[in-house]
Amino acid sequence: MSLNYKTTEWDSKKVILGEGPLNSELPINILVGFHGAGSTPENMLIHGNRLKLKNTFMLFPEGPVDAGEGRWSWWVDGPNQKDSVNDFLKFSSNIISMAQDHLNNRFENIETRNCLWGFSQGGAAALVLTLMGTHSLYKVASVCGFLPEVPEQETKSDSLVPILGIFGTNDDVVPSFLAEHALEEMKNNGHSPTLRETPQGHELNAENLKELCDFFDS
């Protein structure tokens, strides 16, 4: 199943759109892929291109925070992290709304389901958006993700979201206890995480991608 890609600009940021055949008579999954810190949507696209998913509209946005040398992040570290995460929440909610509008302009009376996945800080982005974002979510996956400092506002409690959390015991960037803590926090907030501890390091590998395919297509 080959995917067609095009690059566009939404909310003043680069977004790569990818799709295969879409059947508007069935629910269409909108799958947002968040790259890691100091990275690019192209790096995430390399992995996303190996996800063979049915009836899925993929998008790979560029992070709003300039990390230098053409690389991007979702928020800044340090004392301003909470405010920066709040800006990320607004930015990402806009991107999801624009994806919905994009499909609604092409198809009549369609049902869309919002899904998120990400690696490292991108996994953290998916988890934060699940906790505090404005859109309802169908499924969420995090690989080597964690939770940053979050703004002091109420978390969502409207629905239970299935979450696949993959993390490695040999990860020297995001220690497994941080990833596990983040997923437990998701559970404490009413969501349904499946914790998958592996011997991997800080990476997104072929076995991870197979699990992601099974998760999003089930």
Name each model-derived stretch.
Residues 6-109:
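Serine-hydrolase catalytic machinery in alpha/beta-hydrolase-like enzymes
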Residues 35-37, 118-119, 168:
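Conserved alpha/beta-hydrolase "nucleophile elbow" surrounding the catalytic nucleophile
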Residues 44-47, 175-185:
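Short alpha-helix in the alpha/beta-hydrolase fold that links the catalytic acid
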Residues 46, 128-132:
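Active-site signature of alpha/beta-hydrolase-fold catalytic machinery across serine-
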Residues 117-122, 126:
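Gly/Ala-rich beta-loop-alpha elbow adjacent to hydrolase catalytic centers
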Residues 135-147:
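A conserved short beta-strand
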Residues 164-167, 171:
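Short beta-strand/loop motif that positions the catalytic acidic residue
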Residues 180-218:
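C-terminal catalytic histidine-bearing segment of alpha/beta-hydrolase fold enzymes
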